[in-house]
From Swiss-Prot:
<dbReference type="GO" id="GO:0006633">
    <property type="term" value="P:fatty acid biosynthetic process"/>
</dbReference>
<dbReference type="GO" id="GO:0003989">
    <property type="term" value="F:acetyl-CoA carboxylase activity"/>
</dbReference>
<dbReference type="GO" id="GO:0016743">
    <property type="term" value="F:carboxyl- or carbamoyltransferase activity"/>
</dbReference>
<keyword id="KW-0275">Fatty acid biosynthesis</keyword>
<protein>
    <recommendedName>
        <fullName>Acetyl-coenzyme A carboxylase carboxyl transferase subunit alpha</fullName>
        <ecNumber>2.1.3.15</ecNumber>
    </recommendedName>
</protein>
<feature type="domain" description="CoA carboxyltransferase C-terminal">
    <location>
        <begin position="40"/>
        <end position="293"/>
    </location>
</feature>
<comment type="function">
    <text>Component of the acetyl coenzyme A carboxylase (ACC) complex. First, biotin carboxylase catalyzes the carboxylation of biotin on its carrier protein (BCCP) and then the CO(2) group is transferred by the carboxyltransferase to acetyl-CoA to form malonyl-CoA.</text>
</comment>
<comment type="subunit">
    <text>Acetyl-CoA carboxylase is a heterohexamer composed of biotin carboxyl carrier protein (AccB), biotin carboxylase (AccC) and two subunits each of ACCase subunit alpha (AccA) and ACCase subunit beta (AccD).</text>
</comment>
<dbReference type="InterPro" id="IPR029045">
    <property type="entry name" value="ClpP/crotonase-like_dom_sf"/>
</dbReference>
<keyword id="KW-0808">Transferase</keyword>
<dbReference type="GO" id="GO:2001295">
    <property type="term" value="P:malonyl-CoA biosynthetic process"/>
</dbReference>
<comment type="similarity">
    <text>Belongs to the AccA family.</text>
</comment>
<dbReference type="GO" id="GO:0009317">
    <property type="term" value="C:acetyl-CoA carboxylase complex"/>
</dbReference>
<keyword id="KW-0276">Fatty acid metabolism</keyword>
<keyword id="KW-0547">Nucleotide-binding</keyword>
<dbReference type="GO" id="GO:0005524">
    <property type="term" value="F:ATP binding"/>
</dbReference>
<keyword id="KW-0067">ATP-binding</keyword>
Length: 317
């Protein structure tokens, strides 16, 4: 059984009935329920198609936050070999919210940075729900500097509601760390590819997403603030997040139209959690194609194209 979202209730009800009938048929050794099971399976599939054909921005935000969605470490595990993580910022501590290291992609040495939310209570606490502290962004800068020094392409996976806003993080220079990471991205003379795999929230996301090629999964979101945060500012009422999401243009489709991202990676019907391996493989195909397209571009040109890309964003909106 999947973890169903509120708007998926019609599908949840049908799939619950299917499971009950299958269990009953198995217990009774009966094959007479086959037709009814097939009928319900068709109704369930049709209901899912109907729901996902007309998703609202707020519903997409819920899918982007789905607890079973594939996370950064799953992408790393499936797409890269010989992954060697690096820990710590050499100033204060190691931040588990931000994963970073080196590995091979299709045999090519690359640098990897990504935000990890965790998949259960224990790992979510360990990774601070994907909200990095200053030391996480300083660790990212370490990786970026080494990628530039050794001429390794940089691949980043973005999945965060935003950088950690706690007092301790602010005291250790959260704003400076985010700004430094963003600036370092702009200086790199290597190909940089960024994929928004879930939430891309605020400066915490952009700090590792200033890339030559930026892609989003079909049901991911990317914005300067969460819908709840925007609703709190605009109407002093976070419960109006649905209204905010409808006006913020946070979806992959909106951002592709605005030329903020370079492409959209399709998800299986029902979201990435219903076909993790296929989604991760599709992301791998995009990474491979992007690396091929930038293979013969010199470092200075890559740097200037990246800077120009982000300067153009304001002109296209």
């Amino acid at each position: 059984m999947y973890n169903y979202l509120d708007f998926e209730k019609p599908v949840a009800d049908l799939e619950g009935q299917i499971l009950e009938l299958k269990k009953l048929a198995q217990e009774q050794g009966s094959v007479e329920m086959g037709d009814e099971i097939s009928r319900l399976e068709k109704r369930s599939a049709d209901a899912l198609k109907d729901i996902y054909r007309k998703l609202t921005p707020w519903q997409k935000a819920q899918i982007a936050r789905h607890p079973d969605r594939p996370h950064c470490l799953e992408y790393i595990d499936r797409l890269f070999t010989e992954f060697t993580p690096l820990a710590g910022d050499r100033k204060f501590a190691n931040d588990e919210a931000l994963q970073a290291g080196f590995g091979r992609f299709n045999g090519t040495p690359v640098a990897i940075i990504g935000q990890e939310k965790g998949s259960d209570t224990k790992t979510r606490l360990k990774h601070n729900f994907g909200s990095a502290r200053p030391e996480g962004y300083r660790k990212a800068v370490r990786i970026m500097e080494m990628a530039d020094r050794f001429q390794l392409p940089l691949i980043t996976f973005v999945d965060t509601a935003g950088a950690y806003p706690g007092v301790s993080a602010e005291e250790r220079g959260q704003a400076e760390a985010i700004a430094r990471s963003t600036a370092e991205c702009l200086k790199l003379r290597v190909p940089v590819i960024s994929i928004i795999i879930g939430e891309g929230g605020s400066g915490g996301a952009i700090a590792i997403a200033v890339a030559n090629r930026v892609y989003m999964l079909e049901h991911s979101i990317y914005s300067v603030i969460s819908p709840e945060g925007a609703a709190s500012i605009l109407w002093h009422d976070s419960t109006r997040a649905k209204d905010a999401a409808s006006n913020m243009r946070i979806t992959a489709q909106d951002l592709f139209d605005l030329k903020i991202i370079d492409g959209i990676i399709p998800e299986p019907l029902g979201g990435a959690h219903r076909g993790k391996e296929s989604v991760i493989d599709a992301a791998g195909d995009i990474i491979a194609a992007s690396l091929r397209s930038m293979k013969d571009i010199d470092g200075e040109t890559l740097k200037q194209e990246r800077r120009q890309k982000f300067l153009e964003i304001g002109r296209n909106i």
